[in-house]
Amino acid sequence: MQQLQNVIESAFERRADITPANVDTVTREAVNQVISLLDSGALRVAEKIDGQWVTHQWLKKAVLLSFRINDNQVIDGAESRYFDKVPMKFADYDEARFQKEGFRVVPPAAVRQGAFIARNTVLMPSYVNIGAFVDEGTMVDTWATVGSCAQIGKNVHLSGGVGIGGVLEPLQANPTIIEDNCFIGARSEVVEGVIVEEGSVISMGVYIGQSTRIYDRETGEIHYGRVPAGSVVVSGNLPSKDGKYSLYCAVIVKKVDAKTRGKVGINELLRTID
């Protein structure tokens, strides 16, 4: 694996000079191998190691290189034809392979090659970008978008129209991460490498980026870039210091554990926030 990484790192340093016409065989094969490993889930752009999320920047570099080494080509889709550098993940799937991999894909859902989809996942008409990782038992609902390199945990529900931000550049930026057993309400947006920790519930229409204040009403603490585990979050506002105006924030209205989540429905958690 180190040799593969070395090839990618070296090629990335001279990426400005690489074209589909002049790319060398070693680089092309290395990039294609990484995309294949991302596609199968054998590699992932970010993973939790000793309780901390670690981003493998060289894998992002491989994804960026894939755009340098490939020409656009005609791609057949369910209702139309497309013209792009990245093939669709399911272009060569037959019924046997779908049965073997064990997930459902509802037309016209689109997944780019280099994204991993785990067993028992349901993809409603949605979009999953290259480098993303979608773990077991997750529902990606209608018109939801999973951005490039985003990491989606087990048993997550991304409701209709949810946007999970992608990140390829700048390289130092970390991917957006939704940990296991989270619920993201309709039309909410989580972007810019924000981490939503395990078991959290995000209400409908909540927007969270790195600069969004995440206010815990029980403690008065303000978080940035991270929703603590087990949080129930709704949209809100915080007043300015002079009291003349207020600005948008996300509000943690309560904390729940797995036992409570198991007994109480998501809608009930969001209704009883007083």
Swiss-Prot record:
GO biological process: diaminopimelate biosynthetic process; lysine biosynthetic process via diaminopimelate
Compartmental location: Cytoplasm
Organism: Citrobacter koseri (strain ATCC BAA-895 / CDC 4225-83 / SGSC4696)
Record EC number: 2.3.1.117
Binding site for substrate: 104, 141
CDD domains given in the database record: LbH_THP_succinylT (cd03350)
A GO molecular function held by the record: nucleotidyltransferase activity
Subunit structure: Homotrimer.
Coiled-coil features, chain-numbered ranges: none
Record key words, sorted: Acyltransferase, Amino-acid biosynthesis, Cytoplasm, Diaminopimelate biosynthesis, Lysine biosynthesis, Repeat, Transferase
Recorded metabolic or biological pathway in which this protein acts: Amino-acid biosynthesis; L-lysine biosynthesis via DAP pathway; LL-2,6-diaminopimelate from (S)-tetrahydrodipicolinate (succinylase route): step 1/3
Catalytic activity of the protein: (S)-2,3,4,5-tetrahydrodipicolinate + succinyl-CoA + H2O = (S)-2-succinylamino-6-oxoheptanedioate + CoA
UniProt GO cellular component terms: cytoplasm
Protein name as it appears in the record: 2,3,4,5-tetrahydropyridine-2,6-dicarboxylate N-succinyltransferase
Family, as annotated: Belongs to the transferase hexapeptide repeat family.
